[in-house]
Structure formats: C-alpha cells, structure tokens
C-alpha cells in the first residue's frame, strides 16, 4: 500500500462542491469513480478508492490548485495514470501532478495554510463572460473603502461571525495577508490564512462589499469580528477560487 498526492484544478460550476454526496455530481465522486476504474481494470480483486481532500468546497466554487491523497496499490508509471485520468475525467477537472508521499501524509490535516482568491467584476453592461467565474457587482461601490477595512481582518481572530452560525467550536484563524489586484472592471482579492471556516472568505468579502456600498457601518463590522453576531453578507460562491495549498 502506498500513498499518492494528487494536485488538480477544476471549474466548480457543474458540481456540488468537492465532498461526496449521493445522487449529485461532486468532484470527489468523479475522481474516485474514474480512479477506481483505471487502477482496478482487469484485476480480479478490486481495491476501494477513497480520496481525502484538502478542503471542502461549496457548490460552484472553483480551484486553481486543489490537493487530495489516496492510499492504494498501483504498479504502473504515474505519468500514465495522470494521462489516463485526464482522458477519463470531464474537461472541467484537470490532473496536474501525481506523486508518492509518506504513508502518514494527509492532504487536509497537514496543510499549513491556504490562499483563496475572490473575483469581483464591476459590470454595468451585464457582460456574459464572467457569469460563473466572478461575482458581478452592479451597485456603486467605493473600492477604497474595501481596502481601508481589509486590515481589520488581519491577525489571529475569532471568525465565528463569518461562518454559518455562532457555535462553540474553535473559530480562531490567523489571517496572514489580504491583497487587492485591480484590473478594472475586474478586481481580485487574495486572502491567506492558516485555516478557514465554512463561508468565511465569502462572508469576509461580502461584508467588505456591503461596507463599501454604505449598507453597513464600521460598528457592524466590528461586531462581526467580535463574534457578537453573524454577518449574513455573503458573496456568491462562483467568485471564489482555492488558489494554493501550502505544506
């Protein structure tokens, strides 16, 4: 038995996230199904395939770099496996690299930090080109205000105010940096942290956006950051990309 690390990218538009769900298309469903067929072909005893993903992604979220690992027996060239998988998988999922790693490697728990990017497209003409690749923004927005409050999210803080609901679980995350890449009308916000809670990036971006549109005050933002209440200002899933996983 060996452990293999897979590095992939995908367009999440047609999938209900990474994690397996019965009767709905997910990235995990696709890679496990195709991998099972390839590694067990012409073998009398079939081995079970279980892919451990580096992160759960929501429906519609994309990945520039996503990592999963699989423990299995495989006696052929890994480049052959990569090519075979890419031939079998849908065109919106791409395998970039496969490598053998130590048996104890776990793509989820061994990740030191991750970088997500969020794409905003400030669109007054309803462009069709970014419909599923960025959040289209129609309301007047002060981009300077978004940048101005982004520093409030930096550091080691309790981010339960930016997740699904206030819970007793550990909500502390260390946000290392937040940067803006402006190529108007497209704006990319990059956020790096040691860990992320569910909806955290989307609600951080949605909160910054609402503040920049005058919908909420700085006091509201501070309340969310103190976990006094949960922000319901959630940016669309299809603007979010997992960019990099660090080990």
From Swiss-Prot:
Catalytic residues (positions): 58 (nucleophile)
A Pfam entry, by short name: PseudoU_synth_1
Any one biological process term the GO annotation gives: tRNA pseudouridine synthesis
CDD domains linked to this entry: PseudoU_synth_EcTruA
Chain sites annotated for binding substrate: 116
EC id: 5.4.99.12
MF annotations from Gene Ontology: RNA binding; tRNA pseudouridine(38-40) synthase activity
Reaction catalyzed: uridine(38/39/40) in tRNA = pseudouridine(38/39/40) in tRNA
Keywords: Isomerase, tRNA processing
Family: Belongs to the tRNA pseudouridine synthase TruA family.
Function, as annotated: Formation of pseudouridine at positions 38, 39 and 40 in the anticodon stem and loop of transfer RNAs.
Summary of subunit composition and partner proteins: Homodimer.
UniProt-listed PANTHER family: PSEUDOURIDYLATE SYNTHASE, TRNA PSEUDOURIDINE SYNTHASE-LIKE 1
Name of the protein this chain belongs to: tRNA pseudouridine synthase A
Organism: Hydrogenobaculum sp. (strain Y04AAS1)
Lineage: Bacteria, Pseudomonadati, Aquificota, Aquificia, Aquificales
Record gene name: truA
């Amino acid at each position: 038995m060996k452990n293999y690390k897979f590095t992939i990218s995908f367009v999440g538009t047609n999938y209900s996230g990474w994690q397996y769900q019965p009767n709905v298309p997910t990235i995990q469903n696709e890679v496990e199904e195709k991998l099972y067929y390839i590694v067990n072909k012409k073998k009398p005893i079939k081995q079970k395939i279980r892919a451990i993903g580096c992160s759960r992604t929501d429906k519609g979220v994309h990945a520039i770099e996503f990592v999963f690992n699989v423990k299995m027996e495989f006696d052929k060239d890994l480049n052959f496996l990569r090519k075979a998988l890419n031939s079998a998988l849908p065109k919106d999922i791409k395998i970039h690299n496969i490598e053998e790693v130590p048996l104890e490697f776990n793509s989820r728990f061994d990740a030191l930090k991750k970088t997500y990017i969020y794409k905003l497209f400030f669109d007054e003409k309803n462009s069709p080109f970014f419909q599923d690749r960025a959040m289209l923004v129609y309301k007047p927005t002060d981009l300077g205000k978004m940048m101005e409050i982004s520093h409030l999210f930096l550091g080691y803080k309790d981010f339960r105010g930016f997740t699904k609901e206030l819970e007793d679980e550990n909500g502390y995350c260390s946000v290392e940096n937040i940067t803006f890449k402006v190529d108007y009308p497209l704006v990319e916000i990059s956020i790096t942290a040691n860990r992320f809670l569910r909806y955290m990036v989307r609600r951080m971006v949605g909160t910054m956006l609402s503040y920049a549109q005058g919908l909420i005050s700085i006091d509201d933002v501070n309340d969310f950051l103190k976990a006094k209440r949960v922000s319901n200002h959630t940016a669309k899933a299809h603007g979010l990309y997992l960019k990099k996983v660090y080990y």
